[in-house]
Amino acid sequence: MKTTINNWKLTDSQPMQYVKCSFKSNEGGEYNHYKLIQMDLINPDTKKYEVYFDTLCVDDYLESMRGELSIILASYGYGDDEEDCAEIIERMMEEYGDDVFQVVCECIFEYYGSFQAEVLFTGSEQDCIKFIENYCENN
């Protein structure tokens, strides 16, 4: 299993989650747009998995969905869902530094799962692993 492929970083080996920064803001030099891909088991009986993909921007959640972002971050143990998400993220910066927005995007991606993301492929576990590695090599 490769830990980096074409600037995609493996962030969670269980679902084969890879993350790649797709945009760096000019204001403050923060990375806040990320592409994410991973696989999940969709049918334990047939051992079928699906690969799904999304592009997320932290600013979208900070501007219009602050309460929802607080709930998402709280569900991963990063604060209280009654807190303002900016305060939660500020505390997270102490732990994650420059990677804080990547971690926030990972939380959003995992929270919504394939419900919000685009399903790219369905197949066996090995076929999905190969698909993800190929996707990362070519994108």
Task: Give names to the regions the model predicted.
Residues 19-123:
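Acidic, low-complexity, intrinsically disordered interaction modules
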Residues 1-4, 130-139:
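Short intrinsically disordered terminal tails
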Residues 2-20:
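Extreme N-terminal leader/activation tails
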